């Protein structure tokens, strides 16, 4: 047989096999119209419209009357930032929150005064005192509500974060608790490091924070910062911040390998209960600057995943969704409420605590990070970002407010 005919024969046999396989398995290949009907966004996740429809249908089916934000209020400096995000997420503004309850957990006079101002600024806000132990925060919880528990230290929420959490809870009744994808939590810090979201940053005592000359407002963009300059053998463990002012963390540039070498994040471990000492606040600083850089570059996709089951290892509860029925079934709730919800109850009832990785949020500071982070300009950078991109009108508190 001539070579050309032999090649043609082989080609026809191969094409025939492919056609047969396509016919056999055609039911598993979705049509273009099927893909279009799923309403996926550019990241490949379900669209906002479809998520909202699923949540509303779930509410009707399960008789969930409202979706309520339950905010654990501590400090006005952070809560003023969160306020902008919560107002954006109110149902009347296209979000899912029907109301927000601010739970006062401070006796500081200026914080209490600001809370009153905050609640008066929005008809769908209310507040109440917490009496007694941590468990008393859950007095008055109603079975037929979905609660979004929020720490007032949440200083960034990607648009659709709360909706995404509610959607996951609606789709997966086998989940006990659904968290957002939160930057600066013990286990998620290791996860974000592993996903490649954390950038190389090191502290600097010489450079002053950039401020816009006309407005006097800090520019949140890390691209405005100079590169970090220091000796190759710089030991961040022996470094101390300046005593008289805030300091910056600067991007380490010009390296092509070992990018994170000698930066605090490399000390992060997948263990929520291991004491990391001063590494904990320094790793937080590096993560916050990294998030701001990724926001500026439009690269939040670096953080994302669908679901992550923490396997009872101690997930943070700074931004979580729980039904009132599930909260009430967990009573009595003692002083260690976070561990009770994230570890004890999932272990007891066999329903896991998971993170919804489709939207990103940021938690500013735990108690053992607050002193160190308070010596940085990070909070003001988040304030500047929110004022520019989220707030409708001027933020209710700025750093000059206490000096008026």
Regions found by a protein language model. Give the residues of each.
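Short alpha-helix within the catalytic core of nucleotide-sugar-dependent glycosyltransferases
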Residues: 144, 155, 159-171, 225, ...
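Conserved donor-nucleotide/metal-binding helix-loop-beta segment in metal-dependent transferases, i.e.
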Residues: 160-207
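A conserved hydrophobic helix/loop-capping motif in glycosyltransferases and polysaccharide synthases
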Residues: 68-76
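C-terminal catalytic/acceptor-binding lobe
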Residues: 3-50, 64, 82, 233-404
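Short, well-formed alpha-helical segments that are part of the catalytic scaffolds
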Residues: 47-57, 75-93, 161
């Amino acid at each position: 047989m001539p070579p050309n005919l032999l090649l043609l024969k082989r080609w026809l046999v191969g094409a025939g096999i492919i056609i047969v396989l396509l016919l056999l398995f055609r039911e598993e290949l979705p049509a273009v119209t099927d893909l279009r009907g799923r309403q996926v966004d550019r990241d490949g996740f379900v669209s906002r419209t479809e998520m909202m429809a699923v949540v509303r249908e779930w509410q009707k089916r399960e008789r969930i009357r409202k979706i309520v934000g339950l905010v654990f209020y501590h400090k006005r400096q952070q809560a003023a930032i969160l306020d902008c995000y919560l107002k954006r997420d109110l149902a009347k503004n296209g979000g899912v929150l029907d109301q927000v309850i601010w739970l006062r957990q401070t006796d500081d006079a200026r914080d209490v005064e600001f809370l009153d101002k905050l609640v008066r600024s929005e008809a769908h806000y209310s507040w109440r005192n917490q009496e007694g132990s941590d468990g008393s925060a859950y007095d008055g919880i109603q079975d037929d509500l979905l609660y979004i528990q929020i720490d007032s230290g949440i200083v960034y929420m990607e648009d659709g974060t709360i909706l995404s959490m509610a959607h996951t809870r609606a789709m997966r009744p086998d989940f006990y608790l659904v968290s957002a994808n939160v930057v600066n939590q013990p286990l998620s810090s290791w996860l974000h490091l592993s996903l490649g979201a954390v950038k190389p940053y090191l502290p600097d005592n010489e450079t002053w924070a950039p401020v816009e000359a006309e407005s006097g407002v800090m520019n949140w963009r890390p691209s405005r910062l100079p590169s970090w300059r220091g000796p190759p053998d710089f030991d961040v463990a022996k470094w101390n911040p300046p005593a008289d002012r805030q300091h910056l963390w600067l991007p380490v540039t010009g390296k092509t390998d070992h990018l994170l070498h000698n930066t605090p994040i490399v000390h992060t471990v997948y263990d929520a209960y291991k004491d990391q000492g001063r590494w904990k606040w320094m790793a937080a600083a590096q993560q916050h600057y990294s998030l701001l850089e990724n926001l500026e570059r439009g690269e939040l996709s670096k953080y994302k995943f669908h679901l992550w089951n923490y396997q009872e290892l101690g997930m943070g509860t700074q931004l979580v969704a729980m039904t009132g029925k599930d909260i009430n079934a967990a009573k009595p709730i003692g002083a260690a409420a976070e561990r009770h919800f994230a570890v004890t109850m999932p272990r007891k009832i066999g329903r896991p605590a998971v993170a919804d990785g489709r939207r990103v949020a940021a938690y500013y500071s735990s108690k053992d990070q607050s002193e160190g982070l308070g010596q940085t300009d990070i909070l003001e950078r988040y304030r500047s970002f929110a004022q520019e991109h989220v707030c409708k009108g001027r933020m209710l508190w700025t750093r000059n407010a206490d000096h008026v």
